[in-house]
Amino acid sequence: MSFVRNISDYFNKIDNLCYNQSWESGDKIAKYLSLNDDHSKEAYLHISEYGSTSRRCRVSEDEIIDEIVCLHLHVLHSVHVAKDLISSQSTQIRIIQLFNKEILQKRKDENWFLPIFYRLCTDLRWLSKGAESCASGDDEGDSNANSFFESAAKAITECYRTCVSDVHAEEGKTKKVAMLNMTNQLFQIYFQINKLNLLKPLIRAIDNCGPLYNKFLMADKVAYNYFLGRKALFDGDLILAEKGLVYAFRNCPTESVSNKRKILVYLIPVKMFLGHMPTASLLHRYRLDEFQEVVAAVKDGHLGRVDNALLTNGEFFIKCGIYLVLEKLRTITYRNLFKKVSQMVGKVQIPLDAFQAALRFVGVTDVDMDELECIIANLIAEKKVKGYLAHQHQKLVISKTNAFPTLSSVSSN
């Protein structure tokens, strides 16, 4: 963003950009209304109720944009001077509502201003998170914390309805191109408050949007597939999770190393469940060495090492929200261990004692025969092992061919 000398210059620059009415000018105005831009730190812009003062340095020719800018200055004052994120969040919602009512709903033959709207929504999420932190520190605890995210979601959803009902089809006019960005905004909010079920109609709308999908920005497509993949992982849909996360990783710019790393945090467990283990070089390249020991232990079928690896790097995995997901890798670890036992025995009838001895060898001493049978029965039910239990003879009878199918073939069935 170019240097802003004073408040008059600030209004002038926004006013001049409004005349252009292009997507590029919308991008530039969005920066002038961003809470993370350099201008936000300038003390001369930290003004409360600027719109009500009589000493206005400059009024934009666009009255609605002018009002939005004045409210933005009020937000800057609340954030930097009053240190009141709750009030800031409330004002930001007013901005979103005003933008919806006066711009999205009334300016029917244009959409150049959508980058401004995207920025306003992103800042609303940031303020909602800050307000939630402030509220959780009050005496009332977390009782009202989610209300900030919910009020943000409500405001964005109202805008979503406005955009999807737009009758225009032309790329330079239709507001439907905002669908994917708003879906991503709501994805992030619902992840925060654990209400991913509310995303079902939004996902269905994207699935059925037809040629419109090609008009969405690649950045939004990458983000959407990342969020969709994360949700699918937690839903247990490994095929959809892999599809979404692989798309996100491949289309994320090479220079965006931090974003690729975020994608891999979820793609690695998905690939492991499908039997594809990441290389040590990949983990090291993206600073994900926390996975190294987990990967090695699962491959070796060493349950004790899996538990130790999860314990050692538990804080990292919990922060990423994948600790419980990684715990489910124990099933694959059992499968890999039992496959090794079957290869050592070299027969289709394997005594259960052999499996129990192997478990003790890898540090699992608390599994009795009944629990062992239950573990094997689950592996058979999940089609990770082809065979049956001969309970009376205390043996596992495995198929003569492909007794341990590839995990990817099992997950695709």
Swiss-Prot record:
A GO cellular component annotation in the UniProt record: transcription export complex 2
Entry-linked PROSITE patterns: PCI
Domain of life: Eukaryota
Gene3D superfamilies according to UniProt: Winged helix-like DNA-binding domain superfamily/Winged helix DNA-binding domain (1.10.10.10)
GO biological process entries: poly(A)+ mRNA export from nucleus; post-transcriptional tethering of RNA polymerase II gene DNA at nuclear periphery; transcription elongation by RNA polymerase II
InterPro entries assigned to the protein according to its UniProt record, in alphabetical order: Csn12-like, PCI_dom, WH-like_DNA-bd_sf
Family matches, as SMART domains: PAM
Residue span(s) of domain PCI: 222-403
Gene Ontology molecular functions: double-stranded DNA binding; RNA binding
Family of this protein: Belongs to the CSN12 family.
PANTHER family for the chain: PCI DOMAIN-CONTAINING PROTEIN 2, UNCHARACTERIZED PROTEASOME COMPONENT REGION PCI-CONTAINING
Protein name: PCI domain-containing protein 2 homolog
